[in-house]
Swiss-Prot record:
Keywords assigned by UniProt, alphabetized: Nitrogen fixation
GO biological process: nitrogen fixation
Similarity remark: Belongs to the NifW family.
Subunit structure as annotated in this protein's UniProt entry: Homotrimer; associates with NifD.
Signal peptide range in chain numbering: none
Entry function: May protect the nitrogenase Fe-Mo protein from oxidative damage.
Top-rank taxon, per record: Bacteria
Species per Swiss-Prot/TrEMBL record: Stutzerimonas stutzeri (strain A1501)
The protein's name in its UniProt record: Nitrogenase-stabilizing/protective protein NifW
Family annotation (InterPro entries): NifW (IPR004893)
Presence of keyword Lipid biosynthesis: no
Length: 115
């Protein structure tokens, strides 16, 4: 597992600190979430999409104080990461492509093609 990062200094604006994060590992380290690098390497896009989905479901939390938002953001990131520790991308079906059951076909009569 990666070493847990020290809790960030929240004296400054949380939003400014978040703007500096560019990778799944950056987010996990910033929020002090211990992680297995191989899990993140395989599932980074899925983890971040699930995290985004959880943030959207959480509703309007932007008005909360930074320390409270930090705790909420961390909790949701832990949840998103853990979804992929015990499961896999195909099972979790984060992206639309995993929701497609069968190839979609459409019949177009030849007379419609000719005008």
């Amino acid at each position: 597992m990666s070493e847990q990062a020290a809790e960030p200094n929240l004296d400054g604006p949380l939003d400014e600190a978040l703007e500096e994060l560019v990778s799944a590992e950056d987010f996990l380290n910033f929020f002090g979430v211990p992680f297995v690098p191989s899990v993140v390497q395989v599932n980074r896009l899925h983890i971040m999409q699930r995290y985004h989905d959880y943030l959207c479901q959480a509703g309007d939390i932007e008005h909360l104080q930074d320390a409270v938002r930090y705790a909420v953001y961390r909790k949701l990131l832990v949840r998103a990461y853990e979804d992929f520790v015990a499961s896999d991308a195909q099972t979790e079906k984060v992206f639309k492509v995993f929701h497609m059951h069968e190839p979609q076909t459409t019949f177009v009569p030849i007379d419609q093609l000719l005008g």
